[in-house]
From Swiss-Prot:
Disulfide bonds: none
Keywords: Cell cycle, Cell division, Cytoplasm, GTP-binding, Nucleotide-binding, Septation
InterPro entries: Cell_div_FtsZ, Cell_div_FtsZ_CS, FtsZ/CetZ, FtsZ_C, Tub_FtsZ_C, Tubulin/FtsZ-like_C, Tubulin/FtsZ_2-layer-sand-dom, Tubulin/FtsZ_GTPase_sf
Signal peptide span: none
Entry protein name: Cell division protein FtsZ
Annotated residues for binding of GTP: 21-25, 108-110, 139, 143, 187
Top-level taxon in the UniProt lineage: Bacteria
Main location as per UniProt: cytoplasm
GO biological process annotation, one example: protein polymerization
Organism placement in taxonomy: Bacteria, Pseudomonadati, Pseudomonadota, Gammaproteobacteria, Pseudomonadales
Subunit structure: Homodimer. Polymerizes to form a dynamic ring structure in a strictly GTP-dependent manner. Interacts directly with several other division proteins. Interacts with the SulA inhibitor.
Further comment: Formation of the FtsZ ring is inhibited by SulA.
GO CC annotation terms, alphabetical: cell division site; cytoplasm
Organism for this UniProt entry: Pseudomonas aeruginosa (strain ATCC 15692 / DSM 22644 / CIP 104116 / JCM 14847 / LMG 12228 / 1C / PRS 101 / PAO1)
Length: 394
């Protein structure tokens, strides 16, 4: 018997949820810029703000807590509102393989609710990435502290986190830039990241990168960077790659030692082996020795001279923790007793000493080794041993 199998192409479902006022603006920006292949959701405690949202799905958080009037810049109110609606949050996220959470940190709804939404998504087994902004310095130290606390809470529940300091907008665009243009520039970072991931997953390539590769690179990786670059001309591969990894709006993160790197190259049929190699060589410069690196290529017949590069780098700024040294003084002393005679015997063997019984030789060597080991002047670690353990050993 032959069993008929439906030949339906399964593609990963990507959802973008904007939380609070800043997140709602980002979702509106993406919807107007025709970012395809994703579903948009907007969640807010302010019922009035949800009326002007272009997202297909809107979620009013915590009507019992806030009465639809917002969180009043209080993150705890935003948190309680999200906790009240955990079930509804899980309903709107149902079916997603990957979720982007975007918000402006420092306010009430975004700072308080975003970590709860991330927690729900992770419990559902969804790959969760957050793209957040930090407030301007002139907004006050208190708002900055609230933002930093929210970012730390969010980092505990997301797989990867991208941070955009609003201060960079002023540095890069200048004081004469319009406010709308400045915030649109920040929203472009999110739009570029989502569009890039969507293209990677949904567009089959000659050297294919699928959702499993994305999940491998981004799961449990912490700080991340996403960028896209486009260039044409004889040096297009190098220029596009450098543009992708040098986004001036992103938080100052050290690309050196990235533990996960995903690269997708999109070009016409004239893509050369040398250009493919140029992209790889630039990526290799900041990759960790043990990094997981995946490079995909899409050949688009409609592209002429342009070459697009999308780079996802994760695990940035990671530091290997030093292993905890557990000192057991009794075991340490016996190890020194066993190792010290063996080391001396390897250096010079006193054959006359062999006439003495082994137990006597070990006692004499062991007492000297123990005395040397337990000398506080020679080993400051000795002072870290609790006094009662030191007395037992002595």
């Amino acid at each position: 018997m032959f069993e008929l199998v439906d030949n339906i192409a399964q593609t990963a479902v990507i959802k973008v949820i904007g939380v609070g006022g800043g997140g709602g603006n980002a979702v509106n920006h993406m919807a107007k810029n025709n970012v395809e292949g994703v579903e948009f959701i907007c969640a807010n405690t302010d019922a009035q703000a949800l009326k002007n949202i272009a997202a297909r799905t809107v979620l009013q958080l915590g009507p019992g807590v806030t009465k639809g009037l917002g969180a009043g810049a209080n993150p705890e109110v935003g948190r309680q509102a999200a906790l009240e609606d955990r079930e509804r949050i899980s309903e709107v996220l149902e079916g997603a393989d990957m979720v982007f959470i975007t918000t402006g940190m420092g306010g009430g709804t975004g700072t308080g609710a975003a970590p709860i939404i991330a927690e729900v998504a992770k419990e559902m087994g969804i790959l969760t990435v957050a793209v957040v902004t930090r407030p301007f310095p002139f907004e006050g130290r208190k708002r900055m502290q609230i933002a930093d606390e929210g970012i730390r809470a969010l980092a505990e529940s997301v797989d990867s986190l991208i941070t955009i300091p609003n201060e960079k907008l002023l540095t890069i665009l200048g004081k004469d830039a319009s406010l709308l243009a400045a915030f649109a520039k920040a929203d472009d970072v999110l739009a570029g990241a989502v569009r890039g991931i969507s293209d990677i997953i949904k567009r089959p390539g000659m050297i294919n990168v699928d959702f499993a590769d994305v999940k491998t690179v981004m799961s449990e990786m912490g700080m991340a960077m996403m960028g896209t670059g486009c260039a044409s001309g004889p040096n297009r591969a190098r220029e596009a790659t450098e543009a992708a990894i040098r986004n001036p709006l992103l938080e100052d993160v050290n690309l050196q030692g990235a533990r996960g790197i995903l690269v997708n190259i999109t070009a016409g049929p004239d893509l050369s082996l040398g250009e493919y190699s140029d992209v790889g060589n630039i990526i290799e410069q900041f990759a960790s020795e043990h990094a997981t690196v995946k490079v995909g290529t899409v050949i688009d017949a409609d592209m002429r001279d342009e070459l697009h590069v999308t780079v996802v780098a994760t695990g940035l700024g990671a530091r290997l923790e030093k292993p905890v040294k557990v000192v057991d003084n009794t075991v340490q002393g016996s190890a020194a007793q066993a190792a010290a005679p063996a080391q001396r015997e390897q250096q010079s063997v006193n054959y006359r000493d062999l006439d003495r019984p082994t137990v006597m030789r070990n006692q004499s060597h062991g007492s000297a080794a123990t005395a040397a080991k337990l000398n506080p002047q020679d080993d400051l670690d000795y002072l870290d041993i609790p006094a009662f353990l030191r007395r037992q050993a002595d």
